[in-house]
């Protein structure tokens, strides 16, 4: 069996991964707060840990991996979005507006992540469906002396957990000195964090032993992971921005509520995403949602995925238009090579070894280039699948890669039905090439050059051979530019 080695944030070492139960490998990844469309940075952990999910499924079997990624659908940002709609005149109740907003945002999220080629997790729990489990966990923490109630709030007593700060490498006193915490008069200690907070009549709330209220952010993941994965599970992952305070707080409350377990054995964090070397910011004009890139800029989801995997997850990733263009051209070539080809029975050993070495996706992609250079379409397709690439779903390609010759032979990436509508382009291109041939035979070189310029300008690649002209559609092919030559 392939040995997987992963960098464990908790130990700060790359370690051989040994699951608690090889028959049920368990993975938890923190999901989105569903108040708006997912931005490009939100896509990075989804794609990175989708590769981990695929790798675990390959090594241990698809039926032996459980992957949980939650939706936070109770949050002040969600409330604010619903209140803004209400203020704008929407007649629905705030509760109805919140549900409509979260349902809509989850649908958007699924559309975007499906386009990026991410497999759906085994479970996608919504926080609001697990309020009872959260209340029960908070009650356990209070009973064990790790939490207390003040003014309708329930707070976790941070100094009751002696290992607090171990994940992020911070001491409690240093954290206080750094003023990275919310100080409230009802706290025993500035570091104590909220498990439960009161709700007024206008805000979402649930009845509890401490009055009507709603959960704090951190307790959600602890309760849902316990209910779906148990007190101990294999891997907990997420973005580096969640390491503190979210993941630190998860560890504290989970280990104190369930001391019989160890919570997560391995912690993994992907680094941040930049755009053109800078942090994404609306004021800088470099803030993109995945929907923006897909729909407004016409970048296929598979291309976005390829760019995200081009940098190791442990390093900051810089998105640029040049990288996207390069990835698009590469995938276009690979899709033509794998058109209507059945994948090999097994992926390439070097690709698998690269991914098993702490998800080294750049090394895996380098190896895919070598396989493509050998024109082994079957092996390329099987190996790329481990990275979620070159699958039959075309995922946003506006036109499938097509090649042709004077005989009208065509090749298509993906399913055969993807060719629908492109026959007209073949007929137009071959008619123009025939007109070009006739013009050259009649020594009307001005017209033959004009036809060639028209085709090239539309993104058609022409190669003249002794047997006649061969053509190919480039990645920038635009049928709208196939007019009549001047």
Curated annotation (Swiss-Prot):
Entry binding sites for Zn(2+): 30, 221, 246, 250
Obligatory cofactor(s): Zn(2+)
Predominant cellular place of this UniProt entry's protein: cytoplasm
GO terms under biological process: cysteinyl-tRNA aminoacylation
Residue positions of motif 'HIGH' region: 32-42
GO cellular component entries: cytosol
Keyword tags: Aminoacyl-tRNA synthetase, ATP-binding, Cytoplasm, Ligase, Metal-binding, Nucleotide-binding, Protein biosynthesis, Zinc
GO molecular function (one): cysteine-tRNA ligase activity
Record localization: Cytoplasm
Cofactor binding notes: Binds 1 zinc ion per subunit.
Record-linked Gene3D superfamilies: Cysteine-tRNA ligase, C-terminal anti-codon recognition domain, HUPs
Its EC number(s): 6.1.1.16
Binding-site residues, ATP: 282
Quaternary state and interactors: Monomer.
Name this polypeptide is given: Cysteine--tRNA ligase
Species per Swiss-Prot/TrEMBL record: Cereibacter sphaeroides (strain ATCC 17025 / ATH 2.4.3) (Rhodobacter sphaeroides)
């Amino acid at each position: 069996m392939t040995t997987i080695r992963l960098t464990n944030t908790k130990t700060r070492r790359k370690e051989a991964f040994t699951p608690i139960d090889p028959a049920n490998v368990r993975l938890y990844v923190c999901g989105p707060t569903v108040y708006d469309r997912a931005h490009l940075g939100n896509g990075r952990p989804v794609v990175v840990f989708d590769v981990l999910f695929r790798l675990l499924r390959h090594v241990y079997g698809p039926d032996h991996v459980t992957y949980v990624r939650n939706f936070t659908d109770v949050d002040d940002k969600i409330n604010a979005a619903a209140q803004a709609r209400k203020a704008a005149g929407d007649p629905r109740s705030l509760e109805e507006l919140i549900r409509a907003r979260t349902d809509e945002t989850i649908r958007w999220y699924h559309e975007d992540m499906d386009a990026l080629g991410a497999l759906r997790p085994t479970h996608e729990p919504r926080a609001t469906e697990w309020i009872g489990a959260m209340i029960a966990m908070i009650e356990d923490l209070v009973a064990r002396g790790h939490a207390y109630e003040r003014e309708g709030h329930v707070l976790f007593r941070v100094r009751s957990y002696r290992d607090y700060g171990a994940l992020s490498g911070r001491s409690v006193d240093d954290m206080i000195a750094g003023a990275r915490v919310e100080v409230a008069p009802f706290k025993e200690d500035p570091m104590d964090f909220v498990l439960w907070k009161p709700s007024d009549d206008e805000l979402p709330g649930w009845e509890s032993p401490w009055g009507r209220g709603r959960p704090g952010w951190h307790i959600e993941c602890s309760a849902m992971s316990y209910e779906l994965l148990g007190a101990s599970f294999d891997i907990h992952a997420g973005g580096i921005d969640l390491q503190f305070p979210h993941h630190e707080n998860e560890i504290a409350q989970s280990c104190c509520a369930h001391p019989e377990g160890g919570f997560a054995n391995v912690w993994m964090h992907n680094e941040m995403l930049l755009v053109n070397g800078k942090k994404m910011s609306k004021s800088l004009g470099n803030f993109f949602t995945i929907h923006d890139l897909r729909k407004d800029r016409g970048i296929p989801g598979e291309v976005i995925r390829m760019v995200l995997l081009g940098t190791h997850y442990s390093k900051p990733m810089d998105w640029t238009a040049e990288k996207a263009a390069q990835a698009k051209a590469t995938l276009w070539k690979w899709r033509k090579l794998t058109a209507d080809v059945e994948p090999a029975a097994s992926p390439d050993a070097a690709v698998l070894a690269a991914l098993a070495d702490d998800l080294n996706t750049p090394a895996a992609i380098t190896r895919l280039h070598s396989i493509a250079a050998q024109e082994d379409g079957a092996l390329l397709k099987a190996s790329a699948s481990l990275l979620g690439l070159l699958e039959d779903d075309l995922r946003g390609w506006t036109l499938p890669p097509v090649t042709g010759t004077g005989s009208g032979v065509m090749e298509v990436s993906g399913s055969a039905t993807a060719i629908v509508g492109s026959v007209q382009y073949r007929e137009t291109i071959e008619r123009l090439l025939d007109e070009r041939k006739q013009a050259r035979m009649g020594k009307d070189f001005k017209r033959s050059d004009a036809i060639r310029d028209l085709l090239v300008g539309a993104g058609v690649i022409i190669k003249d051979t002794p047997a006649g002209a061969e053509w190919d559609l480039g990645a920038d092919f635009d049928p709208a530019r196939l007019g009549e030559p001047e």
